[in-house]
Amino acid sequence: MARRPYDMLFKLLLIGDSGVGKTCILYRFSDDAFNTTFISTIGIDFKIKTIELKGKKIKLQIWDTAGQERFHTITTSYYRGAMGIMLVYDITNAKSFDNIAKWLRNIDEHASEDVVKMILGNKCDMSDRRVVSRERGEKIAQDHGISFHETSAKLNVHVDTAFYDLAEAILAKMPDSTDEQSRDTVNPVQPQRQSSSGGCC
């Protein structure tokens, strides 16, 4: 049997309100592309990117979930099997930041107890329109014992760093004996309906 082209498979989720830039972050990382004309994501889509970390080839399966309230019943099932979750807010949108607490509760309710979480304050290139200080982002992350980055999908600021940090944190929690298991337990579950359309930047 031919060897798989990767050693481990990690399922990651991008969670947050609509319009915070989840899809732009995803496409910046997966394709090094940025498009300001993305329409709002309908349902759920995912991208694949394989990275090298600590001498291992890790296949990242990154799911882009719609943030609108009406889609919560759809996204809930996608928490299952997630090993890492990025909670994204827009530094120019106070409501999207306030809702991070709600998303954290949602994760606590539906995701695995040992899932690795990270908070991203996106659109840090728009400092003239900032309404959420970096300190507030750092504090909510610190309060929940999770890591934090400010990112810009537009200017490609800290996007790669965030994904690599999340993958490294997941890898650090996994003993070597789980390598084979990780290949098989987080294979893609096809959603009933997918869209390749994007979200906002």
From Swiss-Prot:
GO biological process terms on file: endocytic recycling; exocytosis; negative regulation of 1-phosphatidyl-1D-myo-inositol 4,5-bisphosphate biosynthetic process; positive regulation of establishment of protein localization; presynaptic dense core vesicle exocytosis; protein transport; receptor recycling
One of the record's GO molecular function terms: GTP binding
InterPro entries from the UniProt entry: P-loop_NTPase, Small_GTP-bd, Small_GTPase, Small_GTPase_Rab
A cellular component annotation (GO) from this entry: Golgi medial cisterna
Sequence segments annotated as region (Disordered): 175-201
Protein location: Early endosome membrane; Late endosome membrane; Golgi apparatus membrane; Endosome membrane
Polar residues bias locations: 184-201
Origin: domain of life: Eukaryota
EC code: 3.6.5.2
Record comment: activity regulation: Rab activation is generally mediated by a guanine exchange factor (GEF), while inactivation through hydrolysis of bound GTP is catalyzed by a GTPase activating protein (GAP). Tbc-4 is a likely GAP of this rab. Denn-4 is a putative GEF of this rab.
Membrane topology designation: Lipid-anchor
Keywords, sorted A to Z: Endosome, Golgi apparatus, GTP-binding, Hydrolase, Lipoprotein, Membrane, Nucleotide-binding, Prenylation, Protein transport, Transport
Protein purpose: The small GTPases Rab are key regulators of intracellular membrane trafficking, from the formation of transport vesicles to their fusion with membranes. Rabs cycle between an inactive GDP-bound form and an active GTP-bound form that is able to recruit to membranes different set of downstream effectors directly responsible for vesicle formation, movement, tethering and fusion. Required for basolateral endocytic recycling, the return of macromolecules and fluid from endosomes to the plasma membrane, in polarized epithelial cells of the intestine upstream of rme-1.
Enzyme class: hydrolase
Pfam entry (one): Ras
Residues with lipidation of kind S-geranylgeranyl cysteine: 200-201
Motif Effector region, residue range(s) on this chain: 38-46
Quaternary structure note: Interacts (GTP-bound form) with ehbp-1 (via C-terminal coiled coil). Interacts (GTP-bound form) with cnt-1 (via C-terminal ankyrin repeat). Interacts (GTP-bound form) with rab-5 GAP, tbc-2 (via putative coiled coil domain). Interacts (GTP-bound form) with amph-1.
Family membership: Belongs to the small GTPase superfamily. Rab family.
Name of protein: Ras-related protein Rab-10
Amino-acid positions noted as binding GTP in the UniProt annotation, renumbered to this chain: 16-23, 64-68, 122-125, 152-154
Record's catalysed reaction(s): GTP + H2O = GDP + phosphate + H(+)
